[in-house]
Amino acid sequence: MNEMSLAELWVAVAFLLFVGILIYVGAHRAIGSALDSRGQRIAAELEEARRLKEEAQKLVAEFKRKQREAEAEAESIVTAAKAEAERLASEAKAKLEDFVTRRTKMAEDKIAQAELQAVADVKAIAADAAAKAAEVLLGSAARGDVGDRLISNAIGEVKTKLN
């Protein structure tokens, strides 16, 4: 055997003795339990991370749902406000039209009343003028009691027909 292989032999024997001592002492159980506990700790951390991820996803979904609800509510509020504004505008327009119609009717009634009064006044003035003209004409043509009676009858008849 050469020197190199003798050295390798001693290294192999020393290694086997070292491993044998470790097995005899129970180091493999300590190393195994340390690896097992580390594996369990890593598994627990992974489970916690998964749980936190699910919780975060639930919160994100909840916030998105609430945002959609808030947007829908805001949209319905805007729609209701527009509808209310349109209703109020049409109501105000209807009231204004009613007011204008009533004012126009009142003005037309006043004008009609004034026209009727003016016609009545003109008829009365015309009747008086006709009666005076008839009195003057008949007064010069007919004299005495018969003339006075004819004039009175004619004046009364003209007044009743013109009024």
From Swiss-Prot:
The keyword Transmembrane helix applies. It is found in: Cell inner membrane. It is a single-pass membrane protein. One of its GO terms (molecular function) is proton-transporting ATPase activity, rotational mechanism. Keywords: ATP synthesis, Cell inner membrane, Cell membrane, CF(0), Hydrogen ion transport, Ion transport, Membrane, Transmembrane, Transmembrane helix, Transport. It comes from the Bacteria. The chain crosses the membrane at residues 6-26. The keyword Ribonucleoprotein does not apply. InterPro entries: ATP_synth_b/b'su_bac/chlpt, ATP_synthase_B_chain. GO terms for cellular component: plasma membrane; proton-transporting ATP synthase complex. F(1)F(0) ATP synthase produces ATP from ADP in the presence of a proton or sodium gradient. F-type ATPases consist of two structural domains, F(1) containing the extramembraneous catalytic core and F(0) containing the membrane proton channel, linked together by a central stalk and a peripheral stalk. During catalysis, ATP synthesis in the catalytic domain of F(1) is coupled via a rotary mechanism of the central stalk subunits to proton translocation. Component of the F(0) channel, it forms part of the peripheral stalk, linking F(1) to F(0). F-type ATPases have 2 components, F(1) - the catalytic core - and F(0) - the membrane proton channel. F(1) has five subunits: alpha(3), beta(3), gamma(1), delta(1), epsilon(1). F(0) has three main subunits: a(1), b(2) and c(10-14). The alpha and beta chains form an alternating ring which encloses part of the gamma chain. F(1) is attached to F(0) by a central stalk formed by the gamma and epsilon chains, while a peripheral stalk is formed by the delta and b chains. HAMAP family: ATP_synth_b_bprime. Belongs to the ATPase B chain family. This is ATP synthase subunit b 1. It comes from Xanthobacter autotrophicus (strain ATCC BAA-1158 / Py2). The gene is atpF1.
